[in-house]
Amino acid sequence: MGIKVYKPTTNGRRNMTGSDFAEITTSTPEKSLLVSMSKTAGRNNTGRITVRHHGGGHKRKYRMIDFKRTTDNVVAKVATIEYDPNRTANIALIVYANGVKSYILAAKGLEVGMTVVSGPDADIKVGNALPLANIPVGTLIHNIELKPGKGGQLVRSAGASAQVLGSEGKYTLVRLQSGEVRMILSTCRATIGVVGNEQQSLINLGKAGRTRHMGIRPTVRGSVMNPNDHPHGGGEGRQPVGRKSPMTPWGKPALGLKTRNKKAKSSKLIVRRIND
């Protein structure tokens, strides 16, 4: 992926950058793998806002991604590399030898014409999926399962990767992108390689309109709200927070408070936390 820099023909264009989509090979997705999406604007079934700053944006269709990779020992050929509006990573359309088509995350270095395969006996090659127990120490991986057969949940965004550090009993030690070291069942699957489109984080949207096009609404500061809307709100003119520390809209400390559930059973599987 390359970064395209726009000329400052207007104020909105100044400093704006975008992807050159050099890796994309087609603009027409596979119809059989598309699902219609209805907009919720961040509301739940009762109409209350459960996710703030959502609404509007361009209409999308969901691409059904195969995060499980359970079609073992059947070679698949990469047919296309495509753009996916629902994620930062690109996706690859693969066609199995039996004719079945599927979408997977496009790893860095994966190109049209290459072959991928999944299963315990798969080679250590970009795009192949296999259990953690069969992946050598030091290998970079992505799309990692937390429960065998559930499908990849970790390390799926553009440019992300994790590294296999070793094994301990029935668990495999994996260092995640954040620096956290976690024990994951060795029967869980992962895909070899780094997620592609790694320069996506360098894109400068340049203007508010591109953000709205993505379905993201403005983020309003709490200090300009009313006191019934935010702990920072109210007062005549500009006022300080009025608390010991900044608060979230729901009245909890905004800085430094650990939000992880202390009773979470998976805590014993975390060997090294992010801030240790």
Swiss-Prot record:
**One GO CC term on file:** large ribosomal subunit
Q: Which GO terms describe its biological process?
A: cytoplasmic translation
Assembly with partners or alone: Part of the 50S ribosomal subunit. Forms a bridge to the 30S subunit in the 70S ribosome.
What is the name of this protein? Large ribosomal subunit protein uL2
Q: Provide the GO MF annotations for this entry.
A: rRNA binding; structural constituent of ribosome; transferase activity
| Gene3D superfamilies in the record | 2.30.30.30, Nucleic acid-binding proteins (2.40.50.140), Ribosomal protein L2, domain 3 (4.10.950.10)
The record ties this protein, via SMART domains, to: Ribosomal_L2, Ribosomal_L2_C
Keywords recorded for this protein, A-Z: Ribonucleoprotein, Ribosomal protein, RNA-binding, rRNA-binding
Tell me yes or no: is Zinc-finger among this UniProt entry's keywords: no
Task: Outline the segment boundaries, as ranges, of region: Disordered.
Answer: 219-268
Ribosomal protein listed as a keyword: yes
Check the record and name the PANTHER family matching this protein: LARGE RIBOSOMAL SUBUNIT PROTEIN UL2M, RIBOSOMAL PROTEIN L2
Instruction: State what this protein does.
Output: One of the primary rRNA binding proteins. Required for association of the 30S and 50S subunits to form the 70S ribosome, for tRNA binding and peptide bond formation. It has been suggested to have peptidyltransferase activity; this is somewhat controversial. Makes several contacts with the 16S rRNA in the 70S ribosome.
